[in-house]
């Protein structure tokens, strides 16, 4: 019998496990995609929609997350293409230099309002326009990637390519040394270990509603919780409210996913990862968590992000006490540093503002776009003072003034840059003080590091991506003359009680609604980080007995305010769709929940909740509260508020395609 050459045997695949699994996977993916298409036809994706999908496909979490991200990426890719067309049109119109960039952006804010663009859409236009600027026009953008002088180590390590090219092609991948391969493997291992955690955080964020009832009704249990091991109020003020830009950059995006894609020379098509990639490669601070190695810097940032994921999950489930989670977060964040680029005069502060700056620097989140110009021409002014005969005025006549009369020497140079937060300086004297309006910080003078020199510059805000973050330094250093004749022993009391650092209670007017002059952008107050003041001194003999005579408590018979901690003030704005007809105000004070409080009628003691309702304006008299001070929401914000977070009610995500004009 002849051999059956070329004959292909057939096999029964009905029992093939791999084939069945593949078929089931495709079937589930098709169902998820069909359900997502139905939802997107409505025009929005709500937490209720996310909850419905999660209940239906909870066991297929990996497929669900992947489909949602792909759906979002397709939509944003279309927006990016439209933004590029518009940017090219504007570039061609104004490339002759007749109009500076900050005036172009201000003009486009009017179109933003008229065409109802979202912050996401406007920001894509700004990115595309700035990427087109070359030559002298590129100097208008601080740290423009088109400048040859821009040498971002993070950018080089990740391949040194632009955001646009990441979408279109896979190139040479990471550019790291052989000695750094071990760090890369650590990052990839961290990604594998935390993949399920990230998917859980992502789905939980989609389902989470602003100031969820679960998040604000947690309890303190003395048998299970240690009151001092509470989650930092700074994180509560960022993540109990739902603010899109924090969700996208810190929860949706994944440092590990970016590194994995670049190491495998694959495209980055995940929209949150693309936004994070753009920010970390265009950040003027460059490395922030490790000076010697950019890939080690990214590993440290990834550690902060992983620790943050765990804390947010606990916080939003009403668990405000976890020493292990906070210890991990604090250790990883402390490895990162403050920078000299933003508010150089505050670079060595170690307070609430420093923590916030470090956290924002980890994610290179710089939402506020500002225009700066020198207060005056320092170089020409100094030259005029030292050698006025060399400063020539009109018609070759030496100028008798300090500055040159040459308009090209003294013409202010406008620069567009981005900052993480806005600093408002307050006076140290609080007696009979007139409140300063927080809005005055939108146009002010600040100190910046330019070419390794700290100089003053006048800044004004062009616009801000969804959030406006203000910072006030509430810690004031006061030295009493009597401490020189009777010095204080630092081994006897904590540093915060050393008489050098106390609360600066200068009043600040805090509006619940803030409108920027350019573009009429509206921001609502969402949360305030407030420092806690403890009154010491003026105590009874029994309490002071045993303390050294040269200590504060031994010296002072008068009450002294000492900063001993911080709390969070959170507001939930009105929302007629969810049945919130008036704003609600909350106090996040997990440590205070452990302290017994005497009942006003002297009938006993009670304890407050970790998160409790607080009146917005009315502060009851101490006579009515049994001698207990209970300031209102805005009283606390005015006197002790240090970080103020405002957000746009419409969020950051795009709602409709970008309109061309």
From Swiss-Prot:
Species of origin: Acanthamoeba polyphaga mimivirus
One Pfam family this sequence matches: Pox_P4B
Biased composition (Basic and acidic residues): 1-11
Key word Calcium present: no
Compositional bias ranges of the Polar residues kind: 15-25
Coiled-coil intervals, chain numbering: 112-140
Residue ranges of the region described as Disordered: 1-26
Tagged with keyword Coiled coil: yes
Taxonomic path: Viruses, Varidnaviria, Bamfordvirae, Nucleocytoviricota, Megaviricetes
Superkingdom of origin organism: Viruses
GO cellular component, one term: virion component
Localization per record: Virion
Keywords: Coiled coil, Virion
Principal subcellular localization: virion
Protein name according to UniProt: Putative core protein L410
């Amino acid at each position: 019998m002849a051999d059956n050459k070329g004959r292909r045997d057939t096999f029964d695949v009905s029992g093939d496990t791999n084939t069945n699994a593949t078929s089931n996977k495709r079937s589930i993916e098709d169902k998820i995609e069909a359900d997502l298409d139905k939802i997107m036809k409505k025009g929005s994706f709500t937490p209720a929609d996310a909850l419905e999908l999660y209940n239906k496909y909870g066991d297929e979490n990996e497929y669900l997350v992947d489909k949602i991200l792909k759906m979002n990426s397709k939509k944003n890719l279309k927006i990016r293409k439209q933004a590029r067309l518009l940017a090219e049109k504007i570039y061609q119109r104004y490339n002759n230099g007749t109009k500076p960039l900050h005036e172009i952006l201000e003009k486009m804010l009017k179109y933003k309002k008229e065409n109802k663009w979202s912050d996401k859409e406007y920001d894509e236009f700004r990115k595309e326009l700035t990427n087109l600027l070359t030559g002298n026009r590129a100097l208008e953008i601080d740290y423009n990637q088109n400048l040859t002088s821009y040498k971002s180590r993070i950018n080089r390590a990740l391949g040194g390519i632009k955001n646009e090219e990441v979408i279109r092609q896979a190139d040479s991948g990471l550019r790291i040394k052989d000695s750094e391969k071990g760090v890369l493997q650590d990052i990839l291992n961290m990604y594998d270990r935390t993949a399920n955690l990230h998917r859980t955080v992502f789905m939980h964020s989609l389902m989470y509603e602003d100031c969820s009832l679960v998040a604000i009704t947690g309890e303190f249990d003395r048998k299970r919780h240690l009151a001092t091991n509470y989650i930092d109020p700074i994180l509560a003020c960022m993540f109990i409210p739902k603010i899109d830009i924090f969700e996208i950059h810190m929860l949706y995006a994944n440092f590990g996913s970016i590194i994995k894609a670049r190491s495998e020379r694959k495209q980055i098509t995940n929209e949150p990862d693309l936004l994070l990639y753009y920010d970390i490669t265009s950040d003027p601070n460059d490395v922030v968590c490790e000076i010697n190695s950019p890939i080690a810097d990214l590993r440290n940032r990834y550690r902060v992000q992983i620790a943050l994921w765990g804390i947010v999950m606990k916080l939003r489930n009403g668990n405000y006490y976890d020493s292990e989670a906070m210890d991990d977060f604090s250790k990883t964040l402390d490895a990162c540093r403050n920078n000299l680029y933003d508010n150089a005069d505050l670079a060595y502060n170690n307070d609430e503002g420093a923590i916030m700056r470090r956290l924002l620097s980890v994610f290179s989140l710089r939402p506020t776009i500002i225009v700066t110009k020198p207060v005056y021409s320092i170089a020409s002014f100094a030259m005029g003072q030292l050698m006025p005969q060399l400063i020539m005025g009109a018609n070759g006549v030496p100028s008798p003034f300090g500055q040159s009369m040459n308009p090209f020497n003294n013409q202010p140079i406008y620069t567009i840059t981005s900052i993480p937060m806005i600093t408002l300086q307050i006076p140290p004297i609080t007696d009979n003080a007139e409140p300063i309006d927080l809005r005055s910080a939108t146009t002010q003078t600040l100190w910046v590091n330019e070419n390794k020199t700290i100089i003053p510059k006048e800044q004004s805000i062009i616009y801000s991506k969804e959030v406006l973050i203000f910072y006030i330094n509430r810690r004031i250093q006061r030295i009493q003359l009597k401490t020189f004749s009777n010095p204080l022993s630092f081994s006897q009391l904590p540093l915060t009680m050393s008489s050098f650092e106390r609360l600066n209670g200068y009043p600040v007017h805090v509006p619940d609604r803030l409108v920027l002059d350019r573009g009429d952008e509206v921001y609502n107050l969402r949360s305030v980080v407030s420092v806690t003041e403890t009154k010491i001194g003026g105590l009874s003999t029994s309490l002071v007995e045993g303390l050294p005579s040269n200590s504060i408590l031994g010296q002072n018979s008068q009450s002294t305010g000492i900063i001993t901690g911080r709390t969070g003030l959170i507001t939930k704005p009105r929302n007629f769709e969810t049945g919130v007809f008036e704003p609600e105000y909350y106090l996040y004070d997990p440590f205070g929940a452990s302290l017994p409080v005497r009942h006003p009628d002297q009938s006993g003691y009670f304890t407050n909740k970790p998160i409790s309702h607080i009146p917005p304006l009315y502060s009851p008299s101490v006579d009515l509260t049994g001698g207990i001070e209970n300031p209102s929401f805005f009283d606390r914000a005015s006197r002790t508020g240090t970080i103020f977070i405002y957000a746009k009610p419409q969020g950051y995500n795009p709602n409709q395609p970008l309109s061309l004009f």
